[in-house]
Amino acid sequence: MRAKIYHFLVNRKPGIRQRYHRFHDGTTGMKKVVSWFYLLWLNFCYYVLFCRFLGEQTEFPVYEEKKPPCAESESVLANRDRRSVSETVSFLMQYEVISFDIFDTLIFRPFSEPTDLFFFLGEKLEILDFKRLRMQAEAEARTQKYKEEKHYEIKLSDIWSRLQNEIGVIKEQGMQMEQALEMEFCYANPFMQQVFTQLREHGKRIVITSDMYLSKAFLSELLQKNGYEGYEELYVSCEYEKSKADGSLYEVVKRAYPDTDSMIHVGDNPVSDVKNAKKHGFEVFYYPNVNRNALLYRSYDMSAVVGGAYRGIVNNKLYNGTEQLPMEYEYGYIYGGLFVLGYCNFIHTYAREHGIDKLLFLSRDGDILRQAYAVLFPEEKTEYVYWSRAAATKLMAR
């Protein structure tokens, strides 16, 4: 019910949504209450006083203009000068111990921002503005940890100890739901999965090093689910109260291997995974974050949930380094699929509402639509019909 009210008052008009979040986000106490009255006032002005300008976003146009590369595909431009899987394996083979980062290196989330997962958790909990509350609780937990122990490394339980007082959800229940979503959404990076597997087949010594509030036990299960097994140790910042962010976790890894200085770390963060690793005696292999070009090429004039998933899925595909795809394929993957999915869903809904028991897809443009429709709704009757465009033009002209 709360989600429906939120959608009704906030999401129907882009301008109202923008103005409300600009005022509401980051507020606490009485100002948060005032923001709710502000939301009601915006709706009153728009629908009762006919202040239609409030429905339009300010500063940013409703539809963005992006200029993706036209001469070559994005994946070709991004991956042409990068090492292939086999070249990466050959390079890493010269080191005795190989350390891997987890998120955005071994494991992908289908989002352009990792915190987008909190949208889905908030929907399950039926809590408005949960993403902000979750991020705020994490920031406050880190601040409190530093005040008490002079470091920022926290566990998921520290975050939910704060959240349960804020939102009224039992800590253990919230933690379980959040971890279940991580397990559901996370998947293996196809590039690094091949690299990892080949290194294991060659008998290389592998460790995994991550700055994370999720427990070692949970991350072990997540890695196993996605095909990462056979590593020697998993170093997680919240377990050791040391981090890559300040370099102290690298010292923990080095102490575990006192007989070698032939160590390399693989990761996507220029500071934590590159600068700090070098500073603490590791060689480094920088794996560029797949979402680094999200602002340049991907659209942001979409809903937060759909837009985050769209950008993440597309960027994970194009920038992981596995393939150099032709422009035609990328055009379909980035743009065409969205339109086809939306149109097929529209046809399905229309047919169901009007009792239509068989759908005819007309040649030639209908061929791809019918193939997609058959995948989405295999139980429905469809037929591909040869049809003259000239006949269609004459029919519509009458």
Task: Label every PLM stretch briefly.
Residues 269-284:
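Acidic, divalent-metal-coordinating active-site segment for phosphoryl/phosphodiester hydrolysis
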Residues 1-100, 328-331, 335-355, 365-369:
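Non-catalytic pre-domain segments flanking phosphatase-related domains
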